[in-house]
């Protein structure tokens, strides 16, 4: 493939010749806020429709989220493959035990106490050398990357930034995206990074620009499995709905079978939520006691400091050594 051909792909299918150009489908590196939101003006929220992300999402919907047209699905597959390739090159620079995931719902408001708690957890862990990973959307996901973005600053500065975000409490409120960009301008981040892994399947939920590195996929199943696989250093589960519950059991199965050659910590934030409202925590404990699950590293607390300690207590020396095979 040569640059003079604009890296075009040709193939024959059903006696038709398709030409798939990589003007935006093939990536050599991950997105960041500048590239994903190229063309977005924080002073004009309506400019989202014509920015890069808005354009891709509109095309995704118009072409069919579940399209069977090979001329549609092949470019998406090529794009996702290139994203995965860039993602694992990026992760190659990290010790797998320093990659920590956060799972939780998009419904968490910026004004919720849990939003600040997630941000503080992420901030502390980032300052301890962890790479924080989430699904890269709003709610608990945004809180993860907001906290990582504020790493290296005081808690008072985090609270000042949070006050700026409260002008748009949820992603459905006008100004949600613009306020994030204003915070990023007011509190620039040059030292710490975080990884968001969003999807255009949920493109109506905008990707948080606080993630410094963004692996955005068309295929949601690849994206979900990737988060759970790369977060060898542990997963923090925050209140969510059906998707979060699914991810809890995906992670439990992965740890039980040691898919990544190690059981990673599963730290739950929200005692009442995970023991009463959606009682998955006592269920997992019971399954462990009856030998149905093995080697799950479970903990639960409402205190951000407790959760940080649980994650930091997980050391490579305490587990079976794994090579950096997933990150190469």
Where are these regions (language model features)?
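Acidic/glycine-enriched connector segments
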Residues: 139-237
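Short, solvent-exposed amphipathic alpha-helical segments in soluble enzyme
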Residues: 118-121, 212, 250-255, 282-286, ...
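C-terminal functional extensions of proteins
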Residues: 227-229, 263-328
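Short, acidic/small-residue loops that bind anionic groups at enzyme active sites
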Residues: 129, 156-165, 238-239, 245, ...
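Short, charged/polar "capping" segments at the starts of alpha-helices
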Residues: 7, 110, 204, 273-279
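Short acidic, glycine/serine/threonine-rich loops at helix termini
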Residues: 113, 144-148, 207, 247-250, ...
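Short beta-strand segments
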Residues: 101-105, 135, 196-199, 238-239, ...
């Amino acid at each position: 493939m040569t640059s003079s051909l604009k890296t075009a792909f040709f193939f024959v299918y059903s006696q038709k010749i398709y030409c798939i150009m990589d003007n935006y489908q093939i990536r050599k590196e991950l997105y960041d806020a500048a590239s994903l939101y190229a063309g977005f003006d924080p002073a004009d929220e309506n400019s989202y429709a014509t920015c890069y992300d808005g354009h891709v999402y509109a095309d995704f919907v118009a072409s069919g989220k579940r399209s069977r047209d090979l001329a549609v699905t092949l470019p998406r597959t090529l794009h996702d493959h290139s994203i995965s390739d860039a993602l694992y090159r990026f992760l190659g620079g990290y010790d797998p035990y320093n990659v920590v995931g956060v799972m939780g719902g998009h419904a968490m408001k910026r004004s919720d106490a849990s939003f600040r708690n997630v941000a503080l957890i992420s901030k502390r862990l980032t300052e301890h050398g962890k790479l924080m990973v989430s699904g890269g959307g709003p709610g608990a996901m945004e809180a993860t990357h907001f906290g990582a973005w504020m790493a290296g600053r005081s808690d008072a500065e985090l609270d000042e930034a949070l006050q700026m975000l409260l002008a748009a409490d949820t992603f459905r409120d006008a100004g949600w995206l613009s306020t994030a960009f204003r915070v990023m301008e007011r509190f620039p981040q040059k030292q710490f990074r975080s990884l968001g892994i969003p999807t255009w399947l949920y493109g109506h939920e905008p990707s948080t620009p606080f993630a410094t590195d963004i692996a955005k996929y068309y295929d949601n199943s690849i994206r979900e499995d990737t988060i759970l696989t790369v977060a060898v250093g542990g997963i923090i589960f925050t209140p969510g709905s059906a998707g979060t519950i699914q991810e809890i059991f995906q992670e439990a199965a992965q740890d039980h079978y040691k898919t990544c050659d190690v059981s990673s910590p599963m730290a739950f934030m929200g005692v009442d939520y995970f023991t009463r409202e959606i009682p998955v925590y006592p269920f997992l404990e019971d399954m462990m006691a009856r030998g149905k699950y093995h080697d799950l590293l479970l903990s639960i607390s409402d205190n951000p400091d407790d959760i940080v300690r649980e994650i930091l207590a997980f050391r490579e020396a305490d587990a079976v050594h794994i090579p950096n095979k997933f990150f190469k």
